[in-house]
Amino acid sequence: MKYRDLRDFIQLLEQRGQLKRIKQEIDPYLEMTEIADRTLRAQGPALLFENPKGSRYPVLANLFGTPQRVAWGMGQEDVSALRDVGEWMAMLKEPEPPKGLRDLFDKLPLFKQILNMPVKRLSKAPCQDIILTGDDVDLNQLPVQHCWPGDVAPLVTWGLTITKGPYKKRQNLGIYRQQLLAKNKLIMRWLDHRGGAIDFREWQEAHPGEPFPVVVAIGADPATILGAVTPVPDTLSEYAFAGLLRQSRTEVVKALSCDLDVPASAEIVLEGYLMPGETAPEGPYGDHTGYYNEVDDFSVFTITHMTMRKDAIYHSTYTGRPPDEPAMLGVALNEVFVPLVRKQFPEIVDFYLPPEGCSYRMAVVTIKKRYPGHAKRVMMGVWSFLRQFMYTKFVIVCDEDVNARDWNDVIWAITTRMDPARDTTLIEHTPIDYLDFASPVAGLGSKMGLDATNKWPGETQREWGTPIHMDEAVKRRVDELWDSLGIFD
């Protein structure tokens, strides 16, 4: 499936009964959040608020409110096919030459799709149909959501922030929330380890005191949006990965104020700069944890140009206690992660990030255990494998007979195969989510690994229990009798 732009995707969702147009006047202040939250919790459609109070621009919400819509956005027909996306990423992360002629032919479709990875630069693009500069730049024209009663100000949530460091060829795309500060200013909340923050830090080292160019694109095509939230290898541009997902090259156009590339079909584009040393207090905001976060200082993004398509659509979301849209993205991206971790650790059977755990704070891993201490090795591997997993506070490792996605199975394994003192691994002073107020220091906390596997000689001195299983012949006999017994008639 190919979507040239966000509007193509909206049309597809509408055809499939997965988009609802809301014609009543709805206030971006709290009302949109309440409607979107109720809809998402009922596994409802994406929402297009056509008459937002105080603005002429419609608001698109709940776009990726189900894992199925995430799969469609990635060009796949169903969620299970996202494993194929993970296979592509595993190959791109650690490419291997074909092992023979058969392997070469098997990989030809992927090699063909790799041809779509270079961007296609345009001289003109719809995202620059309307150009506003200077005093004409006014973010108050946009229906920016004020999501929760305790939020300090409206918040731009789905902006794709585009940056480039002084030492890299590739441009980085990331999604960072941005507090509305003034008609032409936002606060850029990015954490130190994120790509945009790294680019800014390196820029300040190379160009002390000089403004750092930044572009924020709102309402890009789904492949580009999802490319920005997928853990692509550091050497690969999100634009290139979006081309792989879309099966056609990502179309970009040069920004008006700098050399950064802008998604050609984006609905709204904000161009400007960060001035080193210019910061402002950000927050509090309700976040994906289900709590309001602390106030902290972050850099101010000054906007010099605002460009947009004719009849632009403002793309927005909210975050709150799961399930929310980030949690649904997490469920879908979980399927992408499985082939990635399996390539590094072939003994892994399944890898699950429960959405109740704020998408990444807890992982359940099932393995084909081969030796004493194997579970602990897997714990350490998970925490160190992808940058995203350094925020995972709890890793539970179980045997392959346990369904990682069934809490009945997992809790049974924890309570029958674990000794709390022997099988719990605690690690202090590790990187942790800055939004995790439970940690003793912001950004620094502990991790817990739970070894819920059967214990091998060397891990226990006792005879280990044998699981109960019914005789197979008896089960077959009862299967034959079952309907005639009439127990549930």
UniProtKB/Swiss-Prot annotation:
Membrane topology reported for the UniProt record: Peripheral membrane protein
Pathway: Cofactor biosynthesis; ubiquinone biosynthesis
A Pfam family recorded for this sequence: UbiD_C
Binding-site residues for Mn(2+), renumbered to this chain: N172, E238
Superkingdom field: Bacteria
Cofactor dependence: prenylated FMN; Mn(2+)
Species the sequence originates in: Tolumonas auensis (strain DSM 9187 / NBRC 110442 / TA 4)
Protein name: 3-octaprenyl-4-hydroxybenzoate carboxy-lyase
Gene coding for it: ubiD
Active site: D287 (proton donor)
Family: Belongs to the UbiD family.
